[in-house]
């Protein structure tokens, strides 16, 4: 019997990355509230958020293996989520200009009573950015559905001076470690 894998995410980037594994899956969007816990560390928060997404979907599909993830950008004690508007995106990108920040992605996989979570953290350093670069980037519309207001897999890559860690963690799903974890759930393509 083929086991059903569900991706508890509407992120097109997570879908593209999961497609690389060539494991059949379906998508069910989680209705879990994405609220950070004040006294949690960034790592604890990102794992907790991923688990909340998974548990919300697993309640509806108790016989499936459910995979969920959440990504946060963390800089100077602040969480940088998806921007509310162009002004918020400009504020975030100006803050990250010429600086190094952390991107953390938490992953949760649940099968019945078994629930495994992990996170990966990557440091991203930006070049110093000019106001006109930031404005032009915001005008593309790319920042608006991304934590930290940039997509490393798109035009936002032009701002990146270097990364330390897994590139796919920044995109939204550390795919290599995710594949290895799915293997422990007996889900793999090779």
Swiss-Prot record:
Looking up Pfam families in the UniProt record yields: Maf
Cofactor(s) this protein cannot do without:
a divalent metal cation
E.C. numbers: 3.6.1.9
User: Where is the site labelled Important for substrate specificity?
Assistant: 13, 71, 153
Per UniProt, the enzyme's principal EC class comes to hydrolase
Active site as annotated: 70
CDD domains, per the entry? Maf (cd00555)
Example GO biological process term?
nucleotide metabolic process
Carries keyword Transferase? no
| Reactions it catalyzes | dTTP + H2O = dTMP + diphosphate + H(+); UTP + H2O = UMP + diphosphate + H(+)
Q: Does the keyword ATP-binding apply?
A: no
* One cellular component term from this protein's GO annotations in UniProt: cytoplasm
The Swiss-Prot or TrEMBL record annotates one GO molecular function as:
UTP diphosphatase activity
Record keywords: Cytoplasm, Hydrolase, Nucleotide metabolism
Function in brief: Nucleoside triphosphate pyrophosphatase that hydrolyzes dTTP and UTP. May have a dual role in cell division arrest and in preventing the incorporation of modified nucleotides into cellular nucleic acids.
Q: Which family does it belong to?
A: Belongs to the Maf family. YhdE subfamily.
Q: What is this protein called?
A: dTTP/UTP pyrophosphatase
Upper lineage: Bacteria, Bacillati, Bacillota, Bacilli, Bacillales
């Amino acid at each position: 019997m083929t086991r059903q894998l569900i991706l508890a995410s509407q992120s097109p980037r997570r879908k593209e990355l999961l497609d690389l594994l060539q494991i059949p899956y379906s998508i069910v969007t989680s209705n879990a509230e994405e609220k950070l816990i004040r006294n949690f560390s960034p790592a604890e928060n990102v794992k907790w958020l991923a688990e909340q997404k998974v548990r919300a979907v697993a309640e509806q599909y108790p016989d499936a293996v459910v995979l969920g993830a959440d990504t946060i950008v963390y800089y100077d004690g602040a969480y940088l989520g998806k921007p509310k508007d162009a002004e918020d995106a400009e504020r975030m990108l100006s803050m990250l200009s010429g600086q190094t920040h952390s991107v953390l992605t938490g992953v949760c996989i649940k099968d019945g009573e078994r629930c495994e979570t992990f996170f990966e953290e990557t440091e991203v350093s930006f070049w110093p950015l000019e106001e006109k670069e930031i404005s032009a980037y915001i005008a593309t519309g790319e920042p608006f559905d991304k934590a930290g207001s940039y997509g490393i897999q798109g035009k936002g890559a032009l701002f990146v001076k270097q990364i330390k860690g897994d590139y796919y963690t920044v995109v939204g799903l550390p795919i290599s470690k995710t594949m290895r974890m799915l293997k422990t759930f007996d889900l793999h393509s090779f």
